[in-house]
Amino acid sequence: QSLPACWDLSKADPAGVYSYWDHLDYIIKLAEQNGIYIGMVTIWGSQVKAENINAQQAKAYGKFLANRYKNSPNIIWVMGGDIQGDIHPEVWESLATSIKSIDHNHLMTYHPRGRYTSAKWWSKAKWLDFHTFQSGHRKYGQRMGNKDYPIPDNTEEDNWMYVDSTWAYKPIKPVLDAEPSYEDIPKGLHDPNEERWQDYDVRRYAYWSVFAGSCGHTYGHNAIMQMLKPGYPTSYGSDGAEKPWYVALNDPGFNQMKHLKNLMLPLPYFERVPDQSIIAGENGERYNRLLATRGNDYLMVYNYNCVPMKLDLRKVSGSRKNVWWMDAANGQLEYIGAFDNKVITFAPQKATRGISDGVFIAIDASKDYLKKDQKMIEDQSLAGKKRDLNE
């Protein structure tokens, strides 16, 4: 049990008992030893909605959490928990400010309800360091009877639009998709007869979001998020054929996320911005949507459907550009050639939706971020290496 009755926190961690909090200490320390950060969801939104905690209790709880974990280097505080921020906002405000009054060194964010961004309620909150949105698990047209819908109909999969809407709030803060569609989960979550999200879907969500201006991305898997064991049904759309979590580690989407990270980190990161003006033709709709991003001397365009693209190479420095195509599924690079600084039309040779999706990369020819004969980008992951989380 995590908390005693009536929020008497003096009894939350009894001496001589291996308590909930002792076990959480163990998990956080084990994660630190393996270079993993913990997104610490302080309380799930349903508990706040049910009024099982008030602002005064939240203040005391926040102090308890902050004092216990302020010296753990691998904590990111998460307010919310799949809930709209206008439902008892006084609880979230009290909890967040209480933690921040003691713990000044950890980042803090808010996890909203599906199809919302935290910026809708917390754009001015001093305690919030970066925004998240939840694009959710619905396919195009899957409104599912909702009367009050915060997005236009038939835009459910367009997660890039949440980045645009979040950037419109001031002050601008980093943002990422905290809950996109998860690999191997039914579209819409609960119906086992629905088709499931595949590797090419989770790739699309990742590249669309990051190229639209996200600072990172969240990958999820139906089995992994539940640490699903053999013999147990999944909580979401079980058809009786779910794999255990350790088998899901071999699934393609899980192993393809690294190619996006490997692409982004060797390039100048903090100068990168979204820039749809690179696309001199049509931006496209739905699966034909092109997403463009650039730095000062490089530009990239993600193309899910391999549609022909009209692109303006003049948007970044250099009278000549070296151009590559990167296969999003396997990270393989193909050097296309050198091009003059002008508008060009590029048509990917492999045109199979979601199977041959990839990234057009153009770099100022005077720069050496990539080599012409390079077949892959070096793995940028720090997982498995000794890492100082106090850095």
Say what each PLM segment does.
Residues 1-142, 153, 157-158:
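Active-site mouth of glycoside hydrolases
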Residues 22-25, 63, 90-93, 160, ...:
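A structural signal for well-ordered alpha-helical segments within the folded catalytic domains
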Residues 28, 66, 96, 163-167, ...:
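Short amphipathic alpha-helical segments and helix-helix/interface helices
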Residues 31-34, 40-44, 65-66, 70, ...:
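Mature, folded catalytic cores of secreted/periplasmic enzymes
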Residues 65-68, 118-122, 164-166, 199, ...:
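Short, flexible, glycine/charge-rich loop motifs used to bind or transfer phosphoryl groups or to couple energy/partner
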Residues 125-231:
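Catalytic-core region of carbohydrate-active enzymes that cleave or remodel glycosidic bonds
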Residues 171-175, 182-185, 198, 202-337, ...:
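Aromatic- and carboxylate-lined catalytic core of secreted/periplasmic carbohydrate-active enzymes
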